[in-house]
């Protein structure tokens, strides 16, 4: 039996088409995925992301533990509320999950991890936390709503108290603050400005309704996927998993190699991979008719004349750009063009950086 978030009833009242998403009943769309996508790019949309797992870590050695657990380095976190994106790797350098970590105090950090990987994440964290005497609290008492788009912050702020408005005033991206009963973070998964807001479960339905009344459009998983793909953001299980190195998933920037004496899980394997070279994640653009889909083969000839093949990890029609885009994992050596096999047709594609839209504007 699939679980329901505290907002399930609100979704049905808003006319959602509900689907089972990794054991959670979640809205796919509320009538038009396209309208929802455009609302986020041009105005404000919101997503129920309460299926994500919030984990609070407390203890005097929490920072030391996270410096070992994560490939990125929480030593960078010195300002209260600052957030960091990181991979959590296994010993062979594969990605167990990608997550966000927030710093509150020396003995209090917060993780937000994916829903699909919840059980293995919690097991892995618990196993490795034991020697550090960390107190782990899974915050199933909290709901999480993402409000995204150019007008999202202004519309969400109409629901805030004076204290909450002051707390978020001038807050830069990738920060979070606890203000009253809301935890408000300037994070998201769309390439737009906005907030991800955690609140007690019993407050979620009223907050959702108030957002609807303030002109924020409910959005489902369909729009969430096209938005994150336009923004070049990875989806766990597609761009990376336990068999894929972060170096092959455009996550090299999230690996803190310095200081060289910091030991983190997967470091040794990553150093070998960095030395040998890995596949890479690239963007693909196809302006001709057709749609680039997951798992389609990508073929190209490198500078030495070798014929090589990669694979599309995520592909879709981009509502913002009006043509097809994809992320693809390919061998090193790809040039500016490639061929994608769509049924019996060989379609030419342009190879780009793995990001297509930022703040509503084309970058590919």
UniProtKB/Swiss-Prot annotation:
A Gene Ontology term for the protein's cellular component: cytosol
Protein name: Aminomethyltransferase
rRNA processing listed as a keyword: no
Stated role: The glycine cleavage system catalyzes the degradation of glycine.
Enzyme nomenclature, EC number: 2.1.2.10
Reaction equation(s) it catalyzes: N(6)-[(R)-S(8)-aminomethyldihydrolipoyl]-L-lysyl-[protein] + (6S)-5,6,7,8-tetrahydrofolate = N(6)-[(R)-dihydrolipoyl]-L-lysyl-[protein] + (6R)-5,10-methylene-5,6,7,8-tetrahydrofolate + NH4(+)
Gene: gcvT
NCBIfam families hit by this protein: gcvT, PRK00389.1
HAMAP family registered for this protein in UniProt: GcvT (MF_00259)
Protein family membership: Belongs to the GcvT family.
Keywords: Aminotransferase, Transferase
Subunit organization: The glycine cleavage system is composed of four proteins: P, T, L and H.
Gene Ontology terms describing biological process: glycine decarboxylation via glycine cleavage system
Annotated organism of origin: Citrobacter koseri (strain ATCC BAA-895 / CDC 4225-83 / SGSC4696)
